């Protein structure tokens, strides 16, 4: 296969399909989503058979159990796919909305209309459910998409692509609106991220090594985040009960997500009250604690252990594991300075009863999501009321934070006049 020619052809067809998608009615888009959902229900066994072959190859390669679990399409996973498709169909269609319409002294009206981005390239790893999630959001937002999944899920993704194509055709929409790259050759990724004439944006969903490669090689703009080094700062004016709840949930609700707390900052004025209780809670949940000297002194005095001395590297680390770095700081100034220096601009929280300090934290912490008296785990499209998300961005341009339907659109100015000319 000539990868360069193959990817160019996918891009050309996607660009052509994107024009039809931009003018597609809400009813047609919803009909396509429903048709795909019904096709998955109808062909569930065929999907599981294709997936079983992928899973068998993954096991033969010696891939770990966690990877195989992400790859597997269980009955529950298929049900979640179907529910997700119908949920996206139920969301309000943002395309064509005109907002901020204002009369100007010249007599014209000026507003902004929400429009699709065009062609979106999605690059992801082992989870075949992303094929459906990404296709659904791109379809509903009027975009065409090129999906490049992990090589380990090649048969699963091909089977899903067939059903997506059927759903699009049933609704009178172009099948090329959703195309799945049918090769495991890594050169396909290299071509996709440089096709500026056909692809408007890339959304990567994967590990740090993938994102770093794309940052270095992509010519197409990206919606991405590299790390989730999330902090909770407990102020000396915090409510202890709230602090315990927030810090427990932010770390132990799930360890392997990008919105999990990785560093806990505690004001020196509350450390002696909070850390012994929190340390015992983490110890009981088998969380490894990597602590600075001040935190060690308080925790050791309370009989909490074992403790590991934190190094400079710990403040830079996204563990994605039951490991937590803890630092005692002098107060709000030191906490904000630490977060802005070591953080990844993803999600950070303060626990405090002081309104002025809370507002200052919201203003000065340079992150996509900033929270007061709430767990960092809330940084999620569903929890934010977006209905669904394609990912989280910690960049500052275009989309920031959880990216839902609106994040896959842009705005263009529209002008309504009555024959006016500029004076």
Swiss-Prot record:
The keyword Amino-acid biosynthesis applies. InterPro entries: Ald_DH/histidinol_DH, Ald_DH_C, Ald_DH_N, Aldehyde_DH_dom, G-glutamylP_reductase_CS, Glu-5-SA_DH, GPR_dom. GO terms for biological process: L-proline biosynthetic process. GO terms for cellular component: cytoplasm. CDD domains: ALDH_F18-19_ProA-GPR. It catalyses: L-glutamate 5-semialdehyde + phosphate + NADP(+) = L-glutamyl 5-phosphate + NADPH + H(+). PROSITE patterns: PROA (PS01223). Keywords: Amino-acid biosynthesis, Cytoplasm, NADP, Oxidoreductase, Proline biosynthesis. Disulfide bonds: none annotated. Coiled coil: none annotated. It is an enzyme of class 1 (oxidoreductase). The keyword Oxidoreductase applies. Belongs to the gamma-glutamyl phosphate reductase family. This is Gamma-glutamyl phosphate reductase. It comes from Burkholderia orbicola (strain MC0-3).
């Amino acid at each position: 296969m000539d990868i360069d020619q193959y990817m160019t052809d996918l891009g050309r067809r996607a660009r052509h399909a994107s024009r039809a998608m931009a003018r597609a009615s809400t009813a047609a888009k919803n009909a396509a989503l429903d048709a795909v959902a019904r096709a998955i229900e109808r062909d569930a066994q065929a999907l599981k058979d294709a997936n079983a072959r992928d899973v068998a190859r993954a096991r033969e390669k010696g891939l770990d159990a966690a990877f195989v679990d992400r790859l597997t399409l269980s009955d529950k996973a298929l049900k979640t796919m179907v529910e997700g498709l119908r949920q996206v169909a139920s969301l309000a269609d943002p395309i064509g909305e005109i907002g901020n319409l204002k009369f100007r002294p010249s007599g014209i009206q000026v507003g902004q209309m929400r429009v699709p981005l065009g062609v979106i390239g999605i690059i992801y790893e082992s989870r075949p459910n992303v094929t459906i999630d990404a296709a659904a959001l791109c379809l509903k937002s009027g975009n065409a998409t090129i999906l490049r999944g992990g090589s380990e899920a090649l048969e699963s993704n091909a089977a899903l692509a067939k059903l997506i194509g059927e759903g699009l055709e049933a609704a009178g929409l172009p099948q090329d609106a959703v195309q799945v790259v049918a090769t495991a050759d890594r050169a396909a990724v290299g071509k996709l991220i440089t096709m500026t004439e056909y692809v408007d944006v890339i959304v990567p969903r994967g590990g740090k090594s993938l994102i770093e490669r794309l940052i270095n090689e992509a010519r197409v703009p990206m919606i991405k985040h590299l790390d989730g080094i999330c902090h909770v700062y407990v102020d000396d004016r915090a409510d202890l009960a709230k602090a315990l709840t927030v810090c427990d949930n932010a770390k132990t609700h799930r360890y392997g997500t990008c919105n999990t707390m990785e560093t806990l900052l505690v004001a020196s004025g509350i450390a002696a009250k909070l850390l012994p209780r929190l340390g015992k809670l983490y110890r009981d949940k088998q969380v490894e604690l990597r602590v600075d000297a001040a935190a060690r002194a308080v925790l050791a005095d309370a009989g909490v252990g074992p403790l590991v001395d934190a190094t400079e590297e710990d403040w830079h680390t996204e563990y994605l594991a039951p490991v937590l770095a803890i630092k005692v700081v002098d107060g709000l100034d030191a906490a904000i300075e630490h977060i802005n220096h070591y953080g990844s601009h993803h999600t950070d929280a303060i626990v405090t009863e002081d309104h002025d300090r809370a507002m200052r934290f919201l203003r000065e912490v340079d992150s996509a999501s900033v929270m007061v008296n709430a767990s960092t785990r809330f940084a999620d499209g569903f929890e934010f009321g977006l209905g669904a998300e394609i990912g989280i961005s910690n960049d500052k341009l275009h989309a920031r934070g959880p990216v839902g339907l609106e994040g896959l659109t842009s705005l263009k100015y529209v002008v309504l006049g009555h024959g006016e000319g500029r004076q």
